[in-house]
Design a protein with these regions (language model features):
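Structured soluble/peripheral alpha/beta segments that form catalytic or ligand/cofactor-binding pockets
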Residues: 1-345
Length: 345
């Protein structure tokens, strides 16, 4: 297991050449992101806010993304008991940063409003507020709702990852284990979200990416014996020699993990079978999970030079984790997801 570099002081994320000044991981947004410091062209800059809210029975995902040449705004509703999901996305041509997503997740508003839909993520009285509506979401049925996120943990997963190509980087924050309350209306159906059952994660990303990437990401949020608990695991892109993004969240604090491997089963023809049980292991032996899939939110898109092949698989994890102090905790039927995504973008 290799040593990982923790960033412990605040300062600019990028130097005058547009490269990361200090690759590594942190427990908060200590590196300061400024879009004006980026040296790459606006076509290559990618910025997004992604929220997932679930109680293990239903789920809601909201995205506002400005990927330079393309904007992507989407709403997903997932029914894990009924084993179905619906994602509706709206694309925008050449936003080139005009979406004006905030330079910090801790302040400002992310918002987009176009014909037939609107999404707004903002702060109010110490809470994160998510407001959304989209016409013709499921056939002719609209979807709308308001969700309030509270109980943000003291620490989050923050990582600054360089690519081999100069001026390219990814700056990312994952905030797990937020409690969610509010409502969703899908057509004539209304769903009430109560904070004793629903948890949320924020995936906040800013960076300049290379063209072709494949990543693996897994996340879970909930309670373990009454204590807020979850994890963020992932790999696959950039130079992660300084740090991984693998962490446990336990009672508001981060417990750092080494490298985690996703073992996705194969079918008899040698292709990945995402709905068979997976296995997760770590090089420090602090994360071991068997994963039983329930639903694969799969999507494939190919248009010219752009390609996206996604498998976001939701299900239940059973295994064990080890905290920084050596405490071993068993985990049983803990709801979360793991994904494999290939992008040419």
């Amino acid at each position: 297991m290799r040593q990982q570099h923790e960033i412990t002081t605040s300062g600019p994320l990028l130097g005058s050449d547009g490269n990361l000044l200090e690759p590594g991981w942190a427990r908060s947004l200590l590196p300061v992101y400024r879009r004006a410091d980026i040296k790459a062209g606006a076509m290559r800059v990618k910025e997004w806010d992604y929220y997932l809210i679930t109680d293990g029975h239903i789920g809601l995902a909201l995205t506002i993304a400005d990927n330079g040449y393309m904007g992507l705004d989407s709403v997903s509703f997932l029914d894990f008991d009924g084993k179905w999901e619906k994602t509706t996305s709206r694309m925008r041509t050449l936003p080139l940063g005009r979406t004006q997503l905030p330079e910090s997740s801790a302040e400002g508003a992310s918002e987009i409003s176009k014909g037939g839909y609107a999404l707004t993520f903002y702060h109010e009285d110490g809470a994160r507020m998510l407001s959304f509506h989209m016409d013709k979401f499921l056939g002719k049925e609209p979807i709308e709702g308001i969700v309030k996120l509270t109980d943000e943990p003291d620490e989050s997963m923050v990582i600054a990852t360089p690519f081999d190509k100069p001026g390219h980087f990814y700056y990312n924050q994952k905030i797990n284990c937020m409690r969610a309350e509010g409502w969703i209306e899908l057509g004539s159906r209304r769903y009430e979200l109560t904070k004793d059952k629903f948890f949320a994660v924020l995936d906040w990303g800013r960076g300049v990416w290379t063209y072709h990437n494949t990543w693996y990401w897994g996340s879970a949020s909930g309670e373990l014996d009454g204590v807020p608990f979850g994890w963020n695991i992932g790999y696959g892109f950039g130079d992660t020699s300084a740090a991984t993004e693998n962490v446990l969240f336990y009672d508001g604090k981060i417990h750092k993990l080494g490298e985690v491997k996703f073992e996705i089963p194969m079918d008899e023809d040698g292709f990945e079978d995402f709905m068979k049980p997976w296995v997760f292991t770590s090089d420090d032996n602090r994360f071991y999970m068997n994963f039983t899939p329930v639903l694969d939110r799969s999507a494939f898109m190919s248009a010219g030079v752009v390609l996206s092949d996604q498998h976001q698989v939701f299900g239940h994890f059973t295994g064990r984790i080890t905290l920084d102090d050596g405490t071993v905790l068993p985990v049983r039927d803990f709801f979360g997801f793991a994904e494999k995504v290939e992008n040419k973008w």
